[in-house]
């Protein structure tokens, strides 16, 4: 089979788990460990991508540029990657990231809004970058519709398009259906990627199913460090890949050491499946909403799960973090709310 392309997202999606607060020194140390462990690419940015630091999404302890520079200084083999959401990051941020050594970028949109990625994908291609389309909250639209959005990103110039399970809501059949729908419509030369979350404890299983269906790019992170219950834990996925004799180039023990020695000590809240993060997956809520919902719960005395259930019912998507407070206030005003 084709060698897998292992992309680590500890220092981008994982930013949500530490409220986007990490020192450049820690970034450099983690990047050096990942590079030595043989991963193919390392993504670095605010959790919401370039220029994501704000009152709405959460300010970062440092700028994207400070983190990216620290990463670039510690890379030898892996490709430096970042993420950009059109409407948050701009062409100017894309160009600056390229100047600092970023050579691969994922352009992320909501799963039904691929058309807003055209400019950014085209610019990244113009700069000679490796470009992926990143269709977030992929559970929110049927497989065939998602594949049509992937086809748009391909037409703009994306080398790869991801099934991005931002809510950790997809089951194995959901992943299988979406990857097959992609393969049916995309050109044979266009790669497919999987970005899984652990909210339903299915991130490794979903990633394995994706690979079995032809996916070659797999997102994962040290200790699963990421939004909600975290991403696919890279050390667990690599262990399973070894059992399947899949080619990948990563060192299992080195990844285990980095996960336990470097990343877990940074977590102010354990990244795991618990009553709150399981509810994210069950209700199909954007994983990065967890910390915002926990803050609203503390401020207004409403169970986090009740808030998350209502977020899921209303179908909130990335960028609507401010509405979580509105939901909490509505719940306070309406009195006791039953759970399901």
From Swiss-Prot:
Matching SUPFAM superfamilies, A to Z? Aldolase, post-HMGL domain-like
Q: What is its EC number?
A: 4.1.3.39
PANTHER family hit by this protein: 2-ISOPROPYLMALATE SYNTHASE 1, CHLOROPLASTIC-RELATED (PTHR10277:SF9), HOMOCITRATE SYNTHASE-RELATED (PTHR10277)
Give UniProt keywords alphabetically: Aromatic hydrocarbons catabolism, Lyase, Manganese, Metal-binding
Do the record's keywords include Nucleus?
no
User: What's an example Gene Ontology biological process for this entry?
Assistant: L-leucine biosynthetic process
Q: Tell me the residue numbers annotated for binding Mn(2+).
A: 13, 195, 197
Positions with a binding annotation for substrate: 12-13, 166, 195, 286
Task: Indicate the family of this protein.
Answer: Belongs to the 4-hydroxy-2-oxovalerate aldolase family.
Locate the Pyruvate carboxyltransferase domain: which residues?
Answer: 4-256
Which species expresses this protein natively? Rhodococcus opacus (strain B4)
Q: What are the GO MF terms of this UniProt record? A: 2-isopropylmalate synthase activity; 4-hydroxy-2-oxovalerate aldolase activity; manganese ion binding
What Gene3D superfamilies does the record tag this protein with?
A: 1.10.8.60, Aldolase class I
**Name under which the protein is recorded:** 4-hydroxy-2-oxovalerate aldolase 1
Q: Where is this site: Transition state stabilizer?
A: 12
Provide the catalytic activity annotation.
(S)-4-hydroxy-2-oxopentanoate = acetaldehyde + pyruvate
Q: Which residues form the active site?
A: 16
Lineage per the UniProt record = Bacteria, Bacillati, Actinomycetota, Actinomycetes, Mycobacteriales
EC top class, in one word?
lyase
Q: HAMAP family annotated for this entry?
A: HOA
Statement: the UniProt record of this protein carries the keyword Transferase: no
Q: Mind telling me which Pfam families this protein's record contains? A: DmpG_comm (PF07836), HMGL-like (PF00682)
């Amino acid at each position: 089979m084709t060698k897998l392309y292992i992309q680590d997202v500890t220092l981008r999606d994982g930013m949500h788990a530490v409220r986007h607060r990490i020192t450049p020194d820690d970034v450099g140390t983690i990047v050096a460990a990942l590079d030595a462990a043989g991963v193919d690419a390392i993504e670095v940015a605010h959790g919401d991508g370039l220029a994501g630091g704000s009152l709405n999404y959460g300010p970062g302890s440092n700028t994207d540029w400070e983190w990216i520079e620290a990463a670039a200084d510690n890379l030898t083999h892996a490709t430096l990657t970042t993420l950009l959401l059109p409407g948050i990051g701009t062409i100017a941020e894309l160009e600056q990231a390229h100047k600092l050594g970023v050579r691969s970028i994922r352009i992320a949109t909501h799963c039904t809004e691929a058309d807003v990625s055209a400019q950014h994908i085209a610019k990244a291609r113009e700069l000679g970058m490796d470009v992926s389309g990143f269709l977030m909250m992929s559970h929110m639209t049927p497989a065939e519709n998602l594949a049509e959005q992937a086809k748009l990103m391909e037409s703009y110039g994306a080398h790869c398009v991801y099934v991005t399970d931002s809510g950790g809501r997809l089951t194995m059949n959901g992943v299988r259906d979406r990857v097959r729908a992609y393969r049916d419509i995309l050109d044979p030369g266009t790669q497919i990627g999987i970005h899984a979350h652990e909210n339903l404890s299915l991130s490794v299983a979903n990633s394995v199913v994706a690979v079995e269906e032809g996916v070659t790019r797999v997102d994962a992170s040290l200790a699963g460090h990421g939004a909600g219950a975290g991403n696919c834990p890279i050390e667990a996925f690599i262990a399973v890949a070894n059992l399947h004799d899949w080619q990948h180039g990563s060192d299992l023990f080195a990844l285990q050491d980095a996960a336990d020695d470097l990343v877990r000590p940074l977590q102010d809240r354990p990244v795991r499946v618990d009553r709150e993060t399981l509810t994210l997956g069950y209700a199909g809520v954007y994983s990065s909403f967890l910390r915002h919902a926990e803050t609203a719960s503390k401020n207004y005395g409403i169970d986090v799960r009740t808030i998350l259930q209502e977020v899921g019912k209303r179908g909130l998507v990335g960028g609507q973090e401010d509405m979580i407070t509105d939901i909490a206030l509505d719940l306070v005003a309406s009195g006791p709310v039953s759970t399901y």
